[in-house]
Curated annotation (Swiss-Prot):
Alphabetic keyword roster: Cytoplasm, GTP-binding, Nucleotide-binding, Protein biosynthesis
HAMAP family assigned to the protein according to its UniProt record, in alphabetical order: Rel_fac_3 (MF_00072)
Biological process annotations from GO: regulation of translational termination
Lineage of source species: Bacteria, Pseudomonadati, Pseudomonadota, Gammaproteobacteria, Pasteurellales
Name under which the protein is recorded: Peptide chain release factor 3
UniProt KW Repressor keyword: no
Length: 527
């Protein structure tokens, strides 16, 4: 069999990043509508209503209306096969979001045009910078009153340090929103309100000086558009493919996801410009997506996607080669060969068995506790993909049982939740406490809720005197033993049995680092 490169070349794997409430879940819905994956987009407002958004499928997400877990959706568009990784938009889930960004080749950044660049967007952009991920920008919510579009572009350039190349330009906003003008095509696309849940035929006016444009949008707005475009074309950047691929320049589209307008414009841009599946760095070499032999890495573990079965699914990004049903793969970390006959493809919680998958695709492996985040699978070669870190948590709570006899179930539940990256667990060496660490407060609620629904364990969390944690290592065995002996009250094991220093205050941590210069205190740890 010759390896069909055209299959790899038509893949586009991307994630959507945004500040909470910038409209990311709505955009996900509309993208799937264009990809024919769903026929009527389930509106995301009306959190108690029956039409839940397709990508928010865990019980707690349905109640709260926030995307907590990463879903994967695949759909055809133009001549490409697009893999969309939906990431948690809520500020409390940055670690899961971070790891998802290790599995994509490009990102769509969604900005609320009334608010501009917000804090979470800044953090996520820092993460994409680590791998110079190409970014496409969608200025959303044009059906509301927005900030001046030139101001928005300036803010993106100054705050996020990336050049902007406007591809479309808005005509009015809020109640006066009339559509967008496409700079490269010299065409105006006219907006009709109330068309959000299905794909409509859009009226197109050719040419900027076409009198038809004045009739369609009104003389004032038509003239304003011409004036603004003169400024834009003088002051902004032209699109350059090379700068985009390097993560230095972002093409900018305007629209309203709720009104289902402008979404197809950035999808056209994504399929035309975004990179095909890229090579990946492993510990021994770089693996190219065009290689024939299979390789992939696990970036997320999701528990209980099927409430009827107490199962876990490991999400794996295929880096090279082709997955075929029933193939034998090497699980590198444990050195064992496994036959994978039941890998899954996804449509957010709806699963189908994968017959085949290529570089760029995401497949799900059934996991009975043997697979961890960061694991590499190959067709025999011993290598490990790098760059999938664990972060030291910023918040800590002690978990306490309502029924002390359920200690065993509690520990099992917490270890499983920590393996899938929902939370980190620490067991102090000197007592039986169970301390959980997270990047945001909401994760603690998620853990208590999932312990109850999935493990039948009633638990509560309470404050604990821990300010921060660091993984510790030392090359000098004798000095490490002395460090462990003198600091036993501050040492714990994490879910993977790695030794961790838990500090009651930052001052305490700084003192420990000064006292023991041979001990390395790590803020992140490779999975």
């Amino acid at each position: 069999m010759s390896y069909p490169l055209e299959e790899v070349n038509k893949r586009r794997t991307f994630a959507i990043i945004s500040h909470p409430d910038a409209g990311k879940t709505t955009i996900t819905e509309k993208v799937l509508l264009y990809g024919n994956a769903i026929q009527t987009a389930g509106s995301v407002k009306g959190k108690g209503s029956a039409a839940h958004a397709k990508s928010d499928w865990m019980e707690m997400e349905k109640q709260r209306g926030i995307s907590i877990t990463t879903s994967v959706m695949q759909f055809p568009y133009n001549d490409c096969l697009v893999n969309l990784l939906d990431t948690p938009g809520h500020e409390d889930f940055s670690e899961d979001t971070y790891r998802t960004l290790t599995a994509v080749d490009s990102c769509l950044m969604v900005i609320d045009s009334a608010k501009g660049v917000e804090e979470r967007t800044i953090k996520l952009m820092e993460v994409t910078r680590l791998r110079d991920t190409p970014i496409i920008t969608f200025m959303n919510k044009l059906d509301r009153d927005i900030r001046d579009p030139m101001e928005l572009l300036d803010e993106v350039e100054n705050v996020l340090k990336i050049r902007c190349a406007p591809i479309t330009w808005p005509i009015g906003c809020g109640k006066l929103f009339k559509g967008v003008y496409h700079l490269a095509k010299d065409e105006t696309y006219l907006y009709q309100s109330g068309q959000g849940s299905t794909i409509q035929a859009v009226r197109v006016v050719k040419g900027l000086n076409n009198p038809e444009l004045d009739v369609a949008v009104g003389d004032d707005l038509a003239q304003q558009l011409r004036d603004e475009l003169e400024l834009v074309q003088g002051a902004s950047n032209e699109f350059e493919q090379d700068a985009f691929i390097k993560g230095e320049l972002t093409p900018v589209f305007f629209g309203t996801a709720l009104g289902n307008f402008g979404v197809d414009h950035f999808l056209d841009g994504l399929t035309q410009w975004a990179p095909k599946p890229q090579s990946r760095q492993a510990d021994t070499r770089t693996v190219e997506s065009a290689e024939e032999k299979f390789s992939g890495f696990v970036f997320k573990i999701q528990a209980n996607m099927d409430p009827k079965h107490r199962d876990r699914v490991a999400f794996m990004r295929v880096v090279s080669g082709k997955y075929e049903k029933g193939m034998k793969l090497k699980h590198v970390r444990i050195g064992k060969d496994v036959v994978i006959s039941d890998a899954l493809t996804f449509m957010a919680g709806d699963r189908a068995h994968a017959e085949e998958a290529y570089a760029g695709d995401i497949i799900g492996l059934h996991n009975h506790g043997t697979i961890q985040i960061g694991d590499t699978f190959t067709q025999g070669e011993t290598l490990k993909f790098t760059g999938i870190p664990n972060f030291a948590p910023e918040l800590f709570r002690r978990i306490r049982l309502k029924d002390p006899l359920k200690q065993k179930q509690l520990l099992k539940g917490l270890v499983q939740l920590s393996e899938e990256g929902a939370v980190q667990v620490f067991r102090p060496l000197l007592n039986n406490d169970l301390i959980v660490g997270a990047v945001g407060v909401l994760q603690f609620d998620v853990v208590v809720s999932r312990l109850k629904t999935e493990y039948n364990v009633e638990a509560i969390y309470e404050n604990v005197n821990v300010a921060t944690a660091r993984w510790v290592e030392c090359a000098d065995g004798k000095k490490f033993e002395e460090f462990k002996r003198k600091n036993e009250q501050n040492l714990a094991l994490d879910g993977g049995d790695n030794l961790t220093y838990i500090a009651p205050t930052m001052v305490n941590l700084n003192l420990a680092q000064e006292r023991y210069p041979d001990v390395v205190f790590y803020k992140t740890r490779e999975h």
